[in-house]
């Protein structure tokens, strides 16, 4: 049996990767990937943090951010679930738009100039399947492209191009990204490996780190057990850094009793404890409200109202805690859902899968206010009418990458595959990153010059091999191998080759080096000459 199969089939991952913080267990993604071999795959040096909140199921943005200026159109389209105009929460300096009455926390953040509402975010030719639409948002792809990498994973691979070789190191001793949840997110998938780790189900702390172990027998099964123990040992070393950071925060502000709040409390604790982790992902489910979205007697309460209460109170508590922990200058957050809901409600007091919906950007360094206009709605909306998108969701991504993480225009095109408009949603003065430190950290095994390059350029690929079979592949944005410039036996040393890029379309590519157990992927960008 192969080691990866033994690992996968012998005991649950949660049993291999022990608990570390607030009763949540930790595991690395991709049990059979190179990430597993390096397991100490941490990472970061910047002080800027992005917290991504996924609202699973397709949130009804029209009942969350309510168009007061077109209240009659809104009410007529959904008379059985519409929020009474008198109960809509007002926003300072804006008489056109309001919030669901259960979102007093978000109202406070808006009035305190710590919230930006981006109206009608979507993309062309929207998909209404939960799974496919989620993949589109996670990958940052066009609706007709099946991209196998995530937008944050590609970003992290450009920011930390040597990862995971030579990690952890003094520049970035911590995870690049942390997701709270048991399912690995496509958003964190890099060109070759997942760039994050997850904190998952509640269990005991470090049950493997300090446990007493019997000697390993000198048998094939014993050798596999030794391999598992070695992986567990490396994982515990990595988890130890997280536990140390969490242990430095002994007091936090109050949080409400809901699952999203529990996740955000962990995030605040880890940031406050000094982790340099760049991106955190959390999620909250239940937003697929086809029926019983509201109570018949009172549309301000019901299933959707409960969800919005949990989101609002959790985010407000998180921001209060960030201020208390003196980390609010470092943190911004965003919400997204795989799609919105239809303009017109259905006969079951619910809403069906729709297109565009608003996003929340929150934090001390977001530009406060409302980006865009209230969504346009036809006078007599029918069951097939959708809210048209005003902003492509990748414009929001691009704005965060450019203005919060200081990503260059060339790297933006590599990450998002094309240019998208920059929105005034982040304070420009926030961009103070240390990109050279990040990009020089770790061991550089492969590089290209020039990069970006044109059809007429002579591209040189330099690489280091420890000897033996060495493979270099050039992969396009869809994950297809389009060139194999190196596939041969080499002796230990440094080498240079000329890469023939003739005939390749303009766009983002990745050069992947594989040499034994070593693997490294670097982004490439071909531009029009």
Question: Could you tell me what each predicted segment is?
Answer:
Residues 1-313, 317-325, 344, 358-431:
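Feature for exported/extracytoplasmic and membrane-associated proteins, marking the mature portion
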Residues 282, 338, 451:
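Conserved hydrophobic/aromatic pocket- or pore-lining residues that grip, position, or stack substrates
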Residues 277-279, 328, 336, 354-357, ...:
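Active-site lining segments that contact anionic ligands and/or coordinate catalytic metals
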Residues 440-449, 454-529:
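C-terminal outer-membrane/trafficking sorting elements
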Residues 321-329, 333-352, 360:
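Hydrophobic alpha-helical bundle architecture
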Residues 428-442:
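Low-complexity, Pro/Thr/Ser/Gly/Ala-rich linker/spacer regions in secreted
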